[in-house]
């Protein structure tokens, strides 16, 4: 599995436009062969930072995706950014879920009072 993350920061006047373009791409990228997930996230503390995430079943699927026409639209969005993006590409060999947390901490549930819930 391969994860591609693109972190971008925009000026106030271009962020909404960039987000709108990226939102239109989520479905088409997600429907590409080999894509298991596509997400667009906006930073809750700095609303002008966007993160685009794609997860691919294989490196070959991702390479094919980079050559696709729709990737050119993402490159165009990068041109709107206030500076160069931060790019992260992780080649993941395994993924674990909450069972790892339980394995490390044991299966002791958090007390409601620890969570501020009574």
Name each model feature, range by range.
Residues 2-8, 37-66:
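Short, well-ordered beta-strand segments in beta-rich or mixed alpha/beta enzyme
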Residues 9-19:
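Short, surface-exposed ligand-recognition loops at beta-strand->loop->(often short) alpha-helix junctions
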Residues 10-12, 58, 91-94:
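Non-catalytic surface loops within mature trypsin-like serine protease
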């Amino acid at each position: 599995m391969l994860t591609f993350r693109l972190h971008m920061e925009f000026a106030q006047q271009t962020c909404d436009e960039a987000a709108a373009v990226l939102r239109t791409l989520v479905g088409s990228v997600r429907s590409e062969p080999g894509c298991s997930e596509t997400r667009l996230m906006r930073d809750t503390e700095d609303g002008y930072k966007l993160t685009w995430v794609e997860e691919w079943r294989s490196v070959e699927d991702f390479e094919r995706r980079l050559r696709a026409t729709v990737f050119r639209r993402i490159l165009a969005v990068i041109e709107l950014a206030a500076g160069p993006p931060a790019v992260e590409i992780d080649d993941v060999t395994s993924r674990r879920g909450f069972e790892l947390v339980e394995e490390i901490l044991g299966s002791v549930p958090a007390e409601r009072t620890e969570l501020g819930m009574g």
